[in-house]
Design a protein with these regions (language model features):
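Alpha-helix C-terminal capping segments
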Residues: 45-54, 98, 260-265
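A glycine-rich helix N-cap at a beta->alpha junction
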Residues: 77-88
């Protein structure tokens, strides 16, 4: 039995670091180039796994070299994976630019991730795996209709559903009512709530998301920390003071860490603090999955560093 099931995307990331982003027609030399595994689903699954969670990852891969290499990589990491192989479609990939401020721009080639359709999960082994899990963790790099179906099934089975609405998109109230923890950044929160963030209306936006049906909202604010709020609970947490070199994968690391700590029976305060520390370590390193810390690294970091 896996306590955490992650369903989502897998990409091969092609990352270039540069002093600044080019404008149209401009050619720049990259300062650094790396190829690594990524995808929000894979990032979150690996984060939860490295940080002590018992994880099963379900993802859609092409029958190609990237798909084969991805499975070998997951095996080396010790991550339990149930791959859904699709023919004649390439595995997902992403081109990531990172500037000297640690900011990123990402262009996705969804490939097999867009083939992760409801028909692909109409299998007894997947339904049984959901039934045997405690926490279901999802993102938005697979089709919305698939995410909605999984949320519905998990909700009917009284599982804890965590949805990270990344990439940002609108959600209907039906799916919001199926979610136990809605994890969003400012851009994602604006899109769902319909309220523009002005720097001072965080609570207004969160309350709107709760009114729309979410049980608990976690609003991540980067270097300004995070807020976790429900009808019975309201916790604000500041961030760690670290020098960010690459924010790619920070949100995914946060989500995986939160799920991992929650699966161990930790209190919400502790899970939020642990996830914040894991994300803080992540942004000090280059790459998505290469930057995900181990559980020991996070525990040591929390002992030796204080929140702002």
């Amino acid at each position: 039995m896996n306590k955490i099931m992650v369903l989502g995307s897998t990409n091969v990331d092609y990352m270039m670091k540069m002093e600044k982003f080019p404008v149209a027609g401009e050619t720049l030399d990259a300062l650094e180039f790396k190829q690594s595994m990524g995808g929000k689903g894979a990032n979150q699954a690996l984060s939860a796994h490295r940080l002590g969670g018992d994880v099963l990852f379900i993802t859609s891969l092409g029958n190609d070299v990237n798909g084969s290499n991805t499975l070998s990589y997951f095996k080396d990491e010790g991550l339990n994976v149930l791959p859904l192989i699709v023919e004649n479609v390439p595995s997902g990939s992403a081109m990531i630019w990172v500037n000297s401020k640690g900011e990123n721009c990402i262009v996705l080639n969804p490939g097999s991730n867009h083939e992760f359709t409801p028909d692909l999960i109409n299998r007894p082994d997947i339904e049984n795996a959901i039934r045997d899990s405690e926490i279901i963790l999802l993102q938005m790099e697979i089709p919305y209709i698939t995410v909605k179906k999984i949320c519905k099934l998990a909700s009917e089975l009284n599982k804890i559903v965590i949805l990270n609405v990344a990439p940002a998109r609108e959600l209907d109230s039906e799916i919001l009512k199926m979610i136990d923890y809605l994890v969003v950044n400012v851009v994602e929160a604006e899109m769902i709530s319909g309220i523009d963030y002005d720097g001072s209306n965080k609570e207004l936006i969160i309350d709107k998301l709760l009114d729309l049906g979410a049980s608990t909202v976690i609003l991540t604010l980067g270097k300004h920390g995070s807020i976790l709020k429900s009808s019975r609970y309201n916790k604000s947490l500041s961030a760690y003071d670290v020098e960010a070199v690459d924010t790619t994968g920070a949100g995914d690391t946060f989500c995986g860490a939160f799920a991992a700590e929650l699966s161990k029976g930790s209190k919400l305060d502790d899970a939020l603090h642990f996830a914040t520390a894991a994300a803080a370590i992540c942004v000090t390193r280059m790459g998505a999955q290469p930057s995900i810390p181990s559980e020991k690294e996070v525990r040591d970091f929390m002992k030796n560093n204080k929140l702002n």
